[in-house]
UniProtKB/Swiss-Prot annotation:
Name of the protein described by the UniProt record: UDP-glycosyltransferase 91B1
Gene source species: Arabidopsis thaliana (Mouse-ear cress)
Family: Belongs to the UDP-glycosyltransferase family.
Pfam families for this protein: UDPGT
Gene: UGT91B1
Organism taxonomic ancestry: Eukaryota, Viridiplantae, Streptophyta, Embryophyta, Tracheophyta
Enzyme class: transferase
Its EC number(s): 2.4.1.-
Length: 466
């Protein structure tokens, strides 16, 4: 008779951004469902933002005190959504101040494992000293993290040979096979201009942090699966000299949305009035910064496409202030502009939604495709263009055409792309492929559970797992 598996205590510690915290919470629930105890580490305000989880699960929330004395950091700012893009480096400075409280937690609770995020360069040496096993969990897909970073030694030593925007429009030298997963020139210029350094007290840039986080890990966990990008997952292991475990896509379900039944009832009532697969859902993320001209161009495109749409605009876009004059009045019979939180998974799972205009954050793209919704892609920065290239190659969505040098686009091209993906006969390939890949990969619960189970089995028996 087989011996019962030991019950573990696993601590998880995501970066201070909802796009990281939510998949870490998904992972926590999966681990807890196997009978293990999970300590979810963050700050008080971030913990309060998370959706409720079943009291049957042994998931304990551990609040660490984030410094409120860092210059230029707004009062009560505890997540990337609380600060402008130019001030995220100050949040990293405050985050680095959590090391002492984190050490005290490890000393007192003695978890078997710490699962930490890509910016947590100081976590692995603390954990190793205290005898805690270490896994880095990257919430990006493998191709994106390889293109962005490269081998750990290159990132730590600052030896990335790519010094200009033109260097980013071709594959990096550490990718040994042909690929079209690269930046376009206007995207590469944005990467070069991204505010990641130059703040007093923040001595390490993001690539150096990631490199050190890799080096200190025993295993790399990636939010992906072999059915999507096998060659990239294998390359990640080769580049970092570590075992890589794809954990699956951790797709959310409508039940995972935070409780706000009143909001959902209002939205559902509007969606229920429309035909199946006819509504265009537009959401460009909670933290994406886009220009006035881009908002105006998208708005005019939605007006021209003549399809019903539901557009969620969050604070980073300054919402309706940027919309064209008279836009709301002209589209009021078929369009909704929503400026508050929305239950995105519930919207995407509704039968009336036939297309998703997305910035191509990995989590958002996975959500849309887990419900079989084809994508209209408008990537903005960071990993988003790389995700768009990966998914475009699968014909499960179409990018809005943009000038490769300056990123300009026309409202007509927005309308044409939306109609092509959602209603026109020529775009049937995208609708069919999105539905097919939902069944095969993105919404395949059995497949995704197998990946998660494989990782948990590794935690339970790491020697055999490697």
């Amino acid at each position: 008779m087989a011996e019962p598996k030991p019950k573990l205590h696993v601590a998880v510690f995501p970066w201070l951004a909802l796009g990281h915290m939510i998949p870490y919470l998904q992972l926590s629930k999966l681990i807890a469902r196997k009978g293990h105890t999970v300590s979810f580490i963050s700050t008080a305000r971030n913990i309060s933002r998370l959706p409720n989880i079943s009291s049957d699960l042994s998931v304990n929330f551990v609040s660490l005190p984030l410094s409120q004395t860092v210059d230029h950091l707004p009062e009560n700012a505890e997540a990337t959504t609380d600060v402008p893009e130019t001030h995220i480096a100050y949040l990293k400075k405050a985050f680095d101040g959590l090391s002492e409280a984190f050490t005290e937690f490890l000393e007192a609770s003695k978890p078997n494992w710490i699962v930490y995020d890509i910016l947590h360069h100081w976590v692995p040496p603390i954990a190793e000293k205290l005898g805690v096993r270490r896994a880095i969990f990257c919430t990006f897909n493998a191709a994106s993290i390889i293109i962005i970073g490269g081998p750990a030694s290159v990132m730590i030593q600052g030896h990335d040979p790519r010094k200009t925007a033109e260097d980013l429009i071709v594959p990096p030298p550490w990718v040994p096979f042909e690929t079209n997963i690269v930046y376009r020139l206007f995207e590469a210029k944005r990467i070069m201009e991204y505010p990641t350094a130059g703040v007093t007290g923040v001595e390490l840039n993001d690539n150096c942090r990631l490199g050190l986080a890799y080096v200190g890990s025993e295993v790399i966990v990636i939010r992906s699966c072999m059915e999507l990008e096998p060659e990239w997952i294998q390359l990640l292991s080769k580049l970092q000299g570590k075992p890589v475990i794809p954990i699956g896509l951790l797709p959310a379900t409508p039940m995972d949305d935070a409780d706000d039944e009143g909001t959902w009832l209002d939205i559902r009532e509007w969606l229920d009035r429309h035909q199946a697969k006819s509504v265009v859902y537009v959401a460009l993320g909670t933290e994406v910064t886009i220009s006035n001209e881009e908002i105006q161009g998208l708005a005019h495109g939605l007006e021209l496409c003549r399809l019903p749409f539901f557009w969620t605009l969050r604070k980073r876009t300054r919402a309706s202030m940027l919309l064209p004059d008279g836009f709301k009045e002209r589209v009021k019979e078929r369009g909704v502009i929503w400026t508050e939180w929305v239950p995105q998974t519930k919207i995407l799972s509704h039968g009336s939604v036939g297309g998703f205009v997305t910035h191509c954050g990995w989590g958002s793209a996975v959500e849309g495709l887990s419900f079989g919704v084809p994508l209209i892609m408008f990537p903005c920065n960071l990993d988003q263009p790389l995700v768009a290239r990966l998914l475009s190659g699968m014909n499960i969505g179409l990018e809005i055409p943009r000038n490769e040098r300056d990123g300009l686009f026309t409202s007509a091209s927005v309308a044409e792309t939306i109609r092509h993906v959602v209603v026109e006969e020529e775009g049937k390939i995208y609708r069919n492929n999105a539905a097919s890949q939902q069944k095969k990969i993105f919404g395949n619960k059995r497949l995704q559970d197998q990946y998660a189970d494989g990782f948990i089995e590794f935690l339970e028996n790491p020697i055999a797992g490697v």
